[in-house]
C-alpha cells in the first residue's frame, strides 16, 4: 500500500488516517539509527518507521522501502505501506541477540542475499565520507581525518570482486532468529556493491571472528578464501572511516553521548594502525 500524500505527517496522523485500529506499543530497540516504533492491534504488530535523517534526501527513504518490497520473505520483513516520511513493515517475531550468529549460519544468510537480483542503485563510499566530513561538528574536524579522507579519495574504491545487493549494517541487533530461520532488519543503508565490502562492514568482535566468517562465506560462494580475505582487507580502511564518520554525523544530529564515545574509540583504532 502506498499513499500519494506529499506532505510528511505526524505519527498520530499516520495512525488515525491509515491505521485507526492500531496503537503505539513500544519503541523499536534494534540498531542505533532510531526512528522506529511498534504499533499493535490486539496481537498483531507492525513496525512503523520514520524518515529520521534531515540531511538525507527523501529518495533514500524510498529506496529503503523499495529494497524491502523486492526482497524475499526468507531474508527480510515485508514492506506494507509507504507515504513520504513514513513506512510500515512487517514485525518479525523472534529472538534478537547482540552477538552475531555462528559463522556458517551468517555466511549462508549473506550468500543468500547476494544471490538476489540487484536493487538498481550503487553504494558509493567516497561521496558518503565527504558528506560526513562536511556535516559533522566543525570542532571535531582534525588534520588526521582530512588526510585519511584525501588518501582514500586519491586511491579510489577497490575494484569489485562480485557485485550484489548488500545490507551494509550487519550486526547482532539487526538479525532476528525467527521460527523460519535468520532474517535481517533495518535495511536503510542497502544498495548494490562488492560482496567483500559487505563482509568487511560486518560488526565482528575481532579478526579471528572476521576470518571465520570470510572462510565460511568463501566455502558457500566457492571463492578462493585467500583472494576473498585480501579483498576484504582492501575495503577495511574505507569501512573504518565510514564508521567513524557515521558516528560523528549522528553525534552532530542527536547530541547523544554514545555516538561521541564510539567515534573517539574508532579514531583511536585508526591512529594505532597508522
From Swiss-Prot:
Pfam families tied to this protein: APH
EC number, as in UniProt: 2.7.1.89
InterPro entries given in the database record: Aminoglycoside_PTrfase (IPR002575), Kinase-like_dom_sf (IPR011009), Thiamine_kinase (IPR014093)
Pathway: Cofactor biosynthesis; thiamine diphosphate biosynthesis; thiamine phosphate from thiamine: step 1/1
GO molecular function: ATP binding; thiamine kinase activity
Family label: Belongs to the thiamine kinase family.
Protein name: Thiamine kinase
Native species: Salmonella paratyphi B (strain ATCC BAA-1250 / SPB7)
Gene name linked to the record: thiK
Amino acid at each position: 500500500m502506498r499513499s500519494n500524500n506529499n506532505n510528511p505527517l505526524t505519527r498520530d496522523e499516520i495512525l488515525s488516517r491509515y491505521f485507526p485500529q492500531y496503537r503505539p506499543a513500544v519503541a523499536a530497540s534494534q540498531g542505533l539509527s532510531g526512528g522506529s516504533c511498534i504499533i499493535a492491534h490486539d496481537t498483531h504488530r507492525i513496525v512503523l518507521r520514520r524518515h529520521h535523517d534531515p540531511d538525507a534526501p527523501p529518495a533514500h527513504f524510498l529506496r529503503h522501502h523499495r529494497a524491502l518490497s523486492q526482497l524475499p520473505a526468507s531474508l527480510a520483513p515485508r514492506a506494507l505501506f509507504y507515504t513520504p516520511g513514513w513506512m510500515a513493515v512487517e514485525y518479525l517475531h523472534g529472538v534478537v541477540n547482540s552477538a552475531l550468529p555462528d559463522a556458517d549460519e551468517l555466511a549462508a544468510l549473506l550468500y543468500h542475499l547476494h544471490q538476489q537480483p540487484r536493487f538498481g542503485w550503487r553504494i558509493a563510499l567516497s561521496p558518503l565520507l565527504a558528506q560526513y566530513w562536511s556535516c559533522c561538528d566543525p570542532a571535531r574536524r582534525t588534520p588526521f581525518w582530512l588526510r585519511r579522507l584525501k588518501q582514500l579519495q586519491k586511491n579510489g574504491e577497490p575494484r569489485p570482486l562480485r557485485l550484489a545487493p548488500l545490507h551494509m549494517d550487519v550486526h547482532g541487533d539487526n538479525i532476528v532468529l525467527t521460527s523460519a530461520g535468520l532474517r535481517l532488519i533495518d535495511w536503510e543503508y542497502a544498495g548494490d556493491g562488492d560482496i567483500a565490502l559487505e563482509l568487511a562492514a560486518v560488526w565482528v568482535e575481532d579478526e579471528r571472528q572476521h576470518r571465520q566468517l570470510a572462510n565460511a562465506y568463501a566455502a558457500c560462494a566457492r571463492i578462493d578464501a585467500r583472494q576473498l580475505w585480501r579483498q576484504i582487507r582492501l575495503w577495511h580502511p574505507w569501512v573504518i572511516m565510514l564508521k567513524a564518520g557515521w558516528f560523528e554525523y549522528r553525534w552532530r544530529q542527536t547530541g547523544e553521548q554514545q555516538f561521541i564515545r564510539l567515534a573517539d574509540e574508532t579514531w583511536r583504532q585508526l591512529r594505532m594502525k597508522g
